[in-house]
């Protein structure tokens, strides 16, 4: 059995609440030490401010990724909307910057939409790159499915029918449907509320108003 810890929406702020983050991260590390996942996967929004990332937040993020890597064989990271420079997508995003700076061989950054065969496990990651919203990997990227591999979709955006913390239901024709994801599992981020569809849906977050609340939601072991 392959054990995977699915995280999303960490939202490291620029110059605030770093002590609280460290306290919450320590609780996460203790849980990871107990569960011993082979893979940890962060599905978007490592940072909170996409326009300008402070040096302080870069240090917190770099330490966080390095620390996570000590509790797994590999750490998979993809960016979310808060990690990208929306007005200039040709610029290097904040997550890619940190991954390159820490130069940790356990940390794998998926930089585009497509199918990525894992080098350690019989998994194919199906990445829906956030800035490439018009690309559906299953329809637009030629690929022959390997029955001997586990396919896991990685997606950071609302899913049609999902609900946020105040009860708003996301229902628009431009939102992806759960049936668009053809993998064996789907790991999502963006909505900040634990919920389930046909595939597993959960995320870990530091809440804007109640930083400890996510401890009760937990994080998913798949």
Task: List each model region and its residues.
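Conserved catalytic scaffold of divalent metal-dependent phosphoesterases
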Residues: 83-177
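Active-site metal-binding loops of divalent metal-dependent hydrolases
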Residues: 8-12, 45-47, 81-83, 127-129, ...
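Core catalytic region of metal-dependent phosphoesterases/phosphodiesterases
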Residues: 2-3, 10, 14-115, 179
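Conserved beta-sheet core of the metallophosphoesterase superfamily
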Residues: 159-160, 165-208, 213-216, 220-222
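A structural signal for short, well-ordered beta-strand segments and their strand-loop junctions
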Residues: 76-78, 125, 154, 187-188
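Hydrophobic helix-cap positions at the C-terminus of alpha-helices
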Residues: 31-32, 68, 141-145, 214
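Residue-level preference for short coil/turn positions at secondary-structure junctions
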Residues: 36, 71, 119, 146-149, ...
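Structural motif
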Residues: 2-4, 39, 121-122, 150-152, ...
């Amino acid at each position: 059995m392959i054990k995977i810890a699915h995280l999303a929406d960490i939202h490291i702020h620029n110059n605030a609440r770093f002590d609280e983050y460290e306290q919450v991260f320590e609780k996460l590390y203790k849980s990871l030490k107990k569960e011993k996942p082979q893979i940890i996967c962060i599905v978007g929004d490592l940072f909170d401010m996409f326009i300008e990332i402070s040096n302080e937040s870069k240090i917190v993020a770099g330490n966080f990724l390095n620390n996570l890597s000590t509790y797994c064989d590999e750490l998979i990271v993809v960016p979310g909307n808060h990690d990208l420079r929306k007005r200039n997508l040709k610029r290097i995003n904040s997550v890619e910057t940190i991954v390159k700076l820490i130069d940790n061989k356990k940390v794998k950054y998926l930089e585009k939409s497509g199918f990525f065969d894992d080098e350690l496990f019989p998994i194919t990651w199906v990445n829906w790159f956030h800035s490439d919203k018009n690309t559906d990997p299953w329809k637009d990227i030629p690929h022959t499915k390997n029955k001997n591999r586990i396919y896991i979709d990685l997606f950071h955006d609302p899913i049609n029918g999902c609900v946020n913390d105040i009860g708003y239901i996301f229902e628009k024709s431009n939102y992806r449907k759960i049936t668009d994801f053809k993998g064996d599992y789907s790991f999502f981020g963006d909505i900040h509320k634990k919920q389930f569809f046909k595939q597993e849906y959960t995320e870990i977050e530091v809440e804007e108003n109640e930083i400890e609340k996510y401890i009760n939601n937990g994080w998913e072991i798949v």
